[in-house]
């Protein structure tokens, strides 16, 4: 079978390797689609601090069951699935308490261990989640980033009836906003400096879409929600400007959730955060229930994934996909690799 390998930053080759043998507790997945995310792009540019080369990428993935290990039940040949890419120890304090996303030895497929970018991939059945038969493989490859959004939204607890602001309308911010609405938020405002991203958010049903190049962030919140502003602000951009906005304009005693991976060392006014008794939370990846909830939200028509797909590339055009992203950064949301297309 064919397997992708990033040998060095900006260099991708393909090699012929045997189809992996399936162990008793594993399934063999015929890989269909793979999404490219911001962390993959960091690897492509040699800027991911926890990835060494060569590496086979692929952690946002969909496929179908091709073979089932003898100890595995609950799956059928040909069944559509996605894969949870975390590899965890199961023994550390977080793992023992069900928070394996915080494992002390956490590895992620496509970064610290072999990813799914191959025609077939053998994986523990415990990491495989079925997706509905009427869900496309492209959408299936986006369940992973949706799970990130679901887990992030849940850091606030029950958001039903709340007023919510999301900073950053890229794929994760868009999905956070959609998830919050899908979970019952009363009103959701999203901000960005890209009209295209805001148009996508509007297409996905977000209530208020604001370009903060043209409108003051604080004024926009008051216009959207009144003087009480938002109950929670989700920072899905992750830089000093956006976190500064969140801290400055958050209602006193409210919550800020940092969803984005912060860009470098933070320089923010913690004196204001302290004086306003702001509750600043963070979020890390997801757990199985976030996958299940994300799939349910899509199935119920509360989250829309297709509008976020900008372009699809054949497997052998993996490098061209990265080049396309670099050349069209301002107009690209999500690029998908079709592994079964030559």
Predicted feature locations:
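Glycine-rich cofactor phosphate-binding loops and adjacent beta1-alpha1 units
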Residues: 156-160, 199-279, 319
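N-terminal glycine-rich cofactor-binding segment
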Residues: 3-21, 38-67, 82-83, 100-114
């Amino acid at each position: 079978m064919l397997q992708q390998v990033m040998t060095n930053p900006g260099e991708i080759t393909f090699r012929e390797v045997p189809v992996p043998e399936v162990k008793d507790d594993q399934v063999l997945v015929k890989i269909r689609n793979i999404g490219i995310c911001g962390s993959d792009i960091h690897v492509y540019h040699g800027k991911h601090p926890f990835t060494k080369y060569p590496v086979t990428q692929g952690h946002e993935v969909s496929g179908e069951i091709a073979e089932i290990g003898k100890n595995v039940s609950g799956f059928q040949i040909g069944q559509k699935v996605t894969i949870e890419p975390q590899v965890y120890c199961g023994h550390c304090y977080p793992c023992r308490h069900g928070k394996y996303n915080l494992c002390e030895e956490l590895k992620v497929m496509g970064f610290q261990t072999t990813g799914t970018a191959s025609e077939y991939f053998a994986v523990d059945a415990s990491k495989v989640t079925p997706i509905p038969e009427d869900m496309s493989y492209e959408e299936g490859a986006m369940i992973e980033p949706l799970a990130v959004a679901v887990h992030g939204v849940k850091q606030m607890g029950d958001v039903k009836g709340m007023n919510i602001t999301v900073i950053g309308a890229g794929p994760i911010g868009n999905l956070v906003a959609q998830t919050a609405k899908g979970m019952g938020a009363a009103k959701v405002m999203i901000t960005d400096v890209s009209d295209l991203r805001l148009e996508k958010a509007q297409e996905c049903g977000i209530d208020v879409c604001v370009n903060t190049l043209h409108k003051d962030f604080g004024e926009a919140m008051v216009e959207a929600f009144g003087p009480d502003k938002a109950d929670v602000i989700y920072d899905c951009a992750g830089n000093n400007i956006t976190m500064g906005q969140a801290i400055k304009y958050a209602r006193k005693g409210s919550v800020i959730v940092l969803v984005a991976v912060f860009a470098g060392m933070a320089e923010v006014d913690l004196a204001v955060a302290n004086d306003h008794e702001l509750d600043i939370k963070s979020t890390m990846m997801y757990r199985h229930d976030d996958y299940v909830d994300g799939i349910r939200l899509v199935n119920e028509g509360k989250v829309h994934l297709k509008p976020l797909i900008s372009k699809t590339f054949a497997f052998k055009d993996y490098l061209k996909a990265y080049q396309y992203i670099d050349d069209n950064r301002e107009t690209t949301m999500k690029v998908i690799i079709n592994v079964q297309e030559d």
